[in-house]
Structures are given as structure tokens and as C-alpha cells.
Curated annotation (Swiss-Prot):
Lipid-modified residues, N-palmitoyl cysteine kind: 18
S-diacylglycerol cysteine lipid attachment residues: 18
Ranges for region Disordered: 17-105
Protein name as catalogued: Uncharacterized lipoprotein SAB2248c
Lipid bilayer topology: Lipid-anchor
PROSITE patterns reported in the protein's UniProt record: PROKAR_LIPOPROTEIN (PS51257)
Length: 209
């Protein structure tokens, strides 16, 4: 009987030990599974972070490419604008030059004598040279006449009337010679010259005819 009790006690201890070993094995296996899951989760997290970083780097590269393309587009646009501005400036200059030429042509007045002109400077300074060559060197006739008239009016009467003109040549340089009648003094004229630079000068304010 004592042996039976002893045997049962030993069997109970053995089974208890086996059960404890089984629980320990289960706990060990659970820890291994948890560790493996944690490592897998960490690996997934690392992979996800790496993917995000790669995507972020790709995004930076795309943004850099976009900035480079934008800079190139802006530079091309600037160059295009500069070219267009230069072309517009050239066109404006050409237009201005054409306008100036047209104004010159439209304002050109052929030399003429005053109404009922007496031969005053034509007798004093008869011109037998090349009139076309002289007129090419001299300023616009009407401009020169107006300048000479203003100069003549500075002496004596200030409402002198244009009479006649001639051309004088000296060492290849030409000048207009104008006469202006003083309506308040019978037979008196002012003689005024205008050189090729447009400078007007009274040479005789009281020429008597």
C-alpha cells in the first residue's frame, strides 16, 4: 500500500513537472512568435519609411526638374521678350526715320521771290554757280527765310516784308542772301545772310535801292 501511494505521488510529481515544462515551452514559443512578429513589424515599418523617403526624394527630384524647366522657360521668355523689344525698337526707329523723311519731303519749299519783288540782292550778289549743289548744302529754304526775317526785324521796323533772295559762294561754302523791304521807309531794305549751318546775320540793315 505504501508503495502504491509512493508510486502515485511520483507519478503526480512527474506529470506536474511535464505540465510545467509544457507551459514553459509554450511561453518560450509565444515569446519567439511575438519577437518574430515585432521584427516583421519593424521591418515593415523600416520598409515603409524607406519607401516614403524614396518617394520624398523622387518628389524633390521632380520639383527640382520643374524648377529647372521653369527657369529655362523664364530665361527663354526673357530672351524672347528682349528680342521682341529690340525688334520693336528697330521698327520704331525706322518709323521715326521714315516720319522724319516724310516731314522733310512734305515741308520742302522751293526757293521763291516775294510778291512784286524788286531785284535787290540778285543784283548785288548775282549767282551763276551750280544751284542744285548749293541747295543740297544749304538748309531748308523756308526755315532759312523765317530765320532771316526774324533777324531783320530786330533792326528798325519789326514788320519787314520779304523781297528776294540770291546765293553767295565762297571757297566751296554757300549761303543764302535775303532782302526785306521796310514798309515804313521807301526804297530801304535789310540785307540778311544765312549760312549752311543755319546761322542768320544782318549785313546791312538800311540798304538804299
Amino acid at each position: 500500500m505504501k508503495r502504491l501511494v509512493t508510486g502515485l505521488l511520483a507519478l503526480s510529481l512527474f506529470l506536474a513537472a511535464c505540465g510545467q515544462d509544457s507551459d514553459q515551452q509554450k511561453d518560450s514559443n509565444k515569446e519567439k512568435d511575438d519577437k518574430a512578429k515585432t521584427e516583421q513589424q519593424d521591418e515593415k515599418t523600416n520598409d515603409s519609411s524607406k519607401d516614403k523617403k524614396d518617394k520624398k526624394d523622387d518628389s524633390k527630384d521632380v520639383n527640382k526638374d520643374n524648377k529647372d524647366n521653369s527657369a529655362n522657360d523664364n530665361q527663354q521668355q526673357s530672351n524672347s521678350n528682349a528680342t521682341n523689344n529690340d525688334q520693336n525698337q528697330t521698327n520704331n526707329n525706322q518709323s521715326s526715320n521714315n516720319q522724319a523723311n516724310n516731314n522733310q519731303k512734305s515741308s520742302y519749299v522751293a526757293p521763291y521771290y516775294g510778291q512784286n519783288a524788286a531785284p535787290v540782292v540778285r543784283q548785288i550778289y548775282p549767282f551763276n554757280g551750280n544751284k542744285t549743289q548749293a541747295l543740297q548744302q544749304l538748309p531748308n529754304f523756308q526755315t532759312a527765310l523765317n530765320s532771316a526775317n526774324n533777324e531783320a526785324n530786330k533792326f528798325g521796323s519789326n514788320n519787314k516784308v520779304y523781297n528776294d533772295y540770291s546765293i553767295e559762294e565762297h571757297n566751296g561754302n554757300y549761303k543764302y542772301v535775303f532782302s526785306f523791304k521796310d514798309p515804313n521807309a521807301n526804297g530801304k531794305y535789310s540785307i540778311v545772310t544765312v549760312d549752311y549751318t543755319g546761322q542768320a546775320m544782318v549785313t546791312d540793315p538800311n540798304y538804299q535801292q
